[in-house]
Amino acid sequence: MDTRKRGRPEAGSFNSNGGGYKKSKQEMESYSTGLGSKSKPCTKFFSTSGCPFGENCHFLHYVPGGYNAVSQMTNMGPPIPQVSRNMQGSGNGGRFSGRGESGPGHVSNFGDSATARFSVDASLAGAIIGKGGVSSKQICRQTGVKLSIQDHERDPNLKNIVLEGTLEQISEASAMVKDLIGRLNSAAKKPPGGGLGGGGGMGSEGKPHPGSNFKTKICERFSKGNCTFGDRCHFAHGEAELRKSGIV
């Protein structure tokens, strides 16, 4: 009988039962904790989907050179263009003139949050806001954008219109502002007595002409919250402004 003790197989030695080599204790710890395995960059971390494992990930979340270095190592392709957080172009940025010509700066990556800034004539700022903020509220409510009006940095004859939201919201709101300015200028060019907001029906002292239809009907747009003419509107903004036909 062989009385010699059989020694325990050393870690890393051949395992006759398993048909291979056992993993050493250090290797097992590295596998279970992730230590020693962070030798390659995490492609998920550097993608648009992101890595769901956080600090428990077995791959690198920090690589010198960032995305460009990782893309060269893993052939991930060119980096995703970043959306500009300030859509103001060179000089004054975009500008709406008195004729309603646009525009805000370059836009891309729809769905991303951004800020657009463009200039308008200061005389148009009040009409863009509307009586009691009705016009600006309508734009914000319809597009979801946040609209504010600020003083221009250099020209006191201009005001800055600032739009905050997604690029799609900003694009829609910009179109609404452009349309509003166009209608305001069109109404201002109408001769006395012609159409909404042109001053027709008003006498030289700012009173309605006898027999005019000024403020004899309720403004449907005001009832819906989207009248852009304010005090210049020919229709009554509520029962208090309503007058009988032909009565001064």
UniProtKB/Swiss-Prot annotation:
Zinc fingers typed C3H1-type, residue spans: 36-64, 213-240
GO biological process: positive regulation of leaf senescence; regulation of DNA-templated transcription; regulation of photoperiodism, flowering
Region (Disordered) location: 1-37, 87-110, 188-209
PANTHER family: CCCH ZINC FINGER/TIS11-RELATED
CDD domains registered for this protein in UniProt: KH-I_AtC3H36_like
Keywords associated with the record: DNA-binding, Metal-binding, Repeat, RNA-binding, Zinc, Zinc-finger
Gly residues bias: start-end ranges: 90-103, 192-204
Residues of the KH domain: 113-177
Family matches, as InterPro entries: KH_dom, KH_dom_type_1, KH_dom_type_1_sf, ZFP36-like, Znf_CCCH, Znf_CCCH_sf
Pfam families: KH_1 (PF00013), zf-CCCH (PF00642), zf-CCCH_2 (PF14608)
Gene Ontology cellular-component terms listed: nucleus
Single GO term (MF): DNA binding
Gene3D superfamilies assigned: K Homology domain, type 1 (3.30.1370.10), Zinc finger, CCCH-type (4.10.1000.10)
Entry protein name: Zinc finger CCCH domain-containing protein 36
